């Protein structure tokens, strides 16, 4: 019989996560991040992995497990709107930390944390922050990435004030620098980092398979959450991905990732060329270091919402106003997010040419 027939039948009947896929992913995480907790006892935060129905599914389960009404959580604005939509219904207090073109500003985080004493973390009544959520590479929407030094400072603050770090890193494999930045997972000596990875940006978003890496006690609870909610991620897509990864091997997988990154790097260069050509003097931006987004500030217009959502759409330009990435989405914002994931260089050029004309008409 064909080689997939017997394993696939057994696999679909058992309806459990594919053990071979979990094993492959664990080896990959060790190769890429070398987590200090890999050989820890389970009670001390030993690294573990579970498969989720996309990284967003895993993150939502973590939020639901950890957050109670009135809890304090930390994140930097602007932030992925899906994260805000997942956190707001839980009734937590979202405390924002300032960021710039290099990600979260450690001094801003220190200032926020100065409201508490480090020993307050041992007293539940003091309500110290439970976790810091961050997208460290190619942040959506800004395209910025945290520097290694800032990550180290942030991790030390997490140790000092005893909060967890949720490292949402779907664009990790789309870093444009040849040397990938060290991750929070790679420096986690305490078992306080929960890392979310995704296949959506490097294989297909429709597969809806991601994976969480973190301390075993927390990962086991995510698995329990899955068993009583989504039951399990699609066994069929798990099998497809597992067969593909095992056929590629680690070297083949990383070669595929490099080809995908080359594509996005070329897309980024094309969008920047169009921006330089048409938006110079009208807007400003920082060059993204990873991911698929450009964060643009239009000069002289305090709120671009109508320009982007109405006027631009009529000209067949599809972008998002910056306001949707803030807790108060009704507040005016001069920013918009452009994506270079799928448009051709010619389409990017035409879009920014039309946008430039709209900006001039609005000034």
Where are these predicted regions, by residue range?
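Conserved core segment of the aminotransferase class I/II
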Residues: 189-265
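Conserved N-terminal helix/loop that builds the PLP phosphate-binding region
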Residues: 1-6, 114, 314, 360
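Conserved glycine-rich beta-strand-loop-beta hairpin in the small C-terminal domain of fold type I
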Residues: 15, 19, 49, 257-272, ...
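Short hydrophobic/aromatic beta-strand micro-patches
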Residues: 213, 295-297, 339-341
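Short, conserved charged micro-motifs
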Residues: 302-308, 345-350
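Conserved core of the PLP fold type I
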Residues: 6-161, 166, 172-190, 194, ...
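PLP-dependent enzyme catalytic core of the Aspartate aminotransferase-like
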Residues: 314-315, 329-363
